[in-house]
UniProtKB/Swiss-Prot annotation:
GO terms for molecular function: ATP binding; phosphoribosylamine-glycine ligase activity; phosphoribosylformylglycinamidine cyclo-ligase activity. Its main location: cytoplasm. It is found in: Cytoplasm. It comes from the Bacteria. Keywords: ATP-binding, Cytoplasm, Ligase, Nucleotide-binding, Purine biosynthesis. Belongs to the AIR synthase family. CDD domains: PurM (cd02196). This is Phosphoribosylformylglycinamidine cyclo-ligase. One of its GO terms (biological process) is adenine biosynthetic process. Pathway: Purine metabolism; IMP biosynthesis via de novo pathway; 5-amino-1-(5-phospho-D-ribosyl)imidazole from N(2)-formyl-N(1)-(5-phospho-D-ribosyl)glycinamide: step 2/2. The gene is purM. Its EC number is 6.3.3.1.
């Protein structure tokens, strides 16, 4: 008998077993618009006729970054799938889009079916939280390309928004208010710095509970990214939101100006919102400067909305009614040139 594909490191049978394992998870995310099931060459999704007047499709893609390194070290794979979904659906949400469907790409050197199934279980949970269908995906087993026990993830999301309802920041003006929605922690950004400070240089054990934290370090580091979709879509039914920023890599200074017009600047007061203790731990242990912290991490705000000052009370009330404690964190002022964001101590 000649050399087989399995002998070269690609196990087709394991791949087939994996697909069977994840079908029930994908099935839980299905929407009425989905045509067919998991396993086809392409996923089919039919926009219902008459539901939209001028539908505009919005697409986004992202990964989880080196947060995966923490999952590998801890042997915990159940939450990074939520992160994967969150990063893309929160991105397209900034346009006012409702996520419709999601696809994932899972790449590894050797397929460990149990670990991979845990990842996809998390992806399905994230899709449920976002209200979108897990329409399909790709599993790539590439021997010699990844270290044993490691993998990488990429996610792709498509949503829809009415053309007249697109949030583009063009109507933002001086005097408007900024509302911050709290993050659950680091979300999925800044992990290269966090790992260097806490694990490489700080020599902290993942199962340790450092001073200042109320739980083991691994729990704080693997806390999944918050998915804001359902709360914000509900808010959009009650309040005109002029701008939305997903606070990811580059922090507030790098992301908030993306939803502001030129000639304006956002001014935030750091004392107006609470920060998860993981940020203080990183800053203290690594002697990380304040500007570096704000340019790397979300610093406690995962999403920032721009609304008219007179709409602040209603916006906070709507969010509070959904169990979201949001905060008025600043204002929009007149500026010069390209939009900027500053955070006052």
């Amino acid at each position: 008998m000649g050399t087989t594909y399995k002998q070269s490191g690609v196990d087709i049978e394991a791949g087939d077993a994996f697909v069977e394992r994840i079908k029930p998870h994908a099935a839980r995310t299905m929407r009425p618009e989905v045509m067919g099931g998991v396993g086809g060459f392409g996923g089919l999704f039919a926009l219902p006729p008459g539901k939209y007047q001028q539908p505009v499709l919005v697409a986004g893609t992202d990964g989880v970054g080196t947060k995966l390194k923490v999952a590998f070290a801890a042997g915990r794979h159940g939450t990074v799938g939520i992160d994967l979904v969150a990063m893309s659906v929160n991105d397209i949400l900034t346009c006012g889009a409702e996520p419709l469907f999601f696809l994932d790409y899972f790449a590894t050197g050797r397929l460990e079916v149990d670990d991979a199934a845990e990842v996809v279980k998390g992806i399905a949970l994230g899709c449920e939280q976002a209200g979108c269908a897990l329409l399909g995906g790709e599993t790539a087993e590439m021997p010699g390309f990844y270290a044993r026990g490691e993998y990488d993830l990429a996610g792709f999301c498509v949503g829809v928004v009415e053309r007249a309802a697109i949030i583009d920041g063009k109507s933002v003006k001086p005097g408007d208010a900024l509302i911050g929605l709290p993050s659950s922690g680091l979300h999925s950004n800044g992990y290269s710095l966090a790992r260097k400070v806490l694990l490489d240089d700080g020599k902290l054990a993942l199962d340790a509970t450092p001073e200042g934290l109320d739980r083991p370090l691994v729990d704080a580091l693997l806390e999944p990214t918050r998915i804001y979709v359902k709360d914000v879509l509900a808010l959009l039914q009650a309040v005109k939101v002029k701008g939305l920023a997903h606070i990811t890599g580059s922090g507030i200074p790098g992301n908030l100006p993306r939803c502001l017009p030129d000639g304006t600047r956002a001014v935030l007061s750091e004392q107006t919102w609470p920060k998860p203790p993981i940020f203080d731990l990183i800053a203290k242990l690594g002697s990380v400067a304040r500007d570096e912290m704000f340019n790397t991490f979300n610093m406690g705000l995962g999403l920032i909305l721009v609304v008219a000052k007179e709409d602040v009370a209603q916006a906070l009330s709507v969010l509070s009614g959904r169990g979201v404690q949001a905060f008025e964190v600043g204002r929009v002022e007149a500026g010069q040139g390209e939009a900027t964001a500053v955070i006052d101590p």
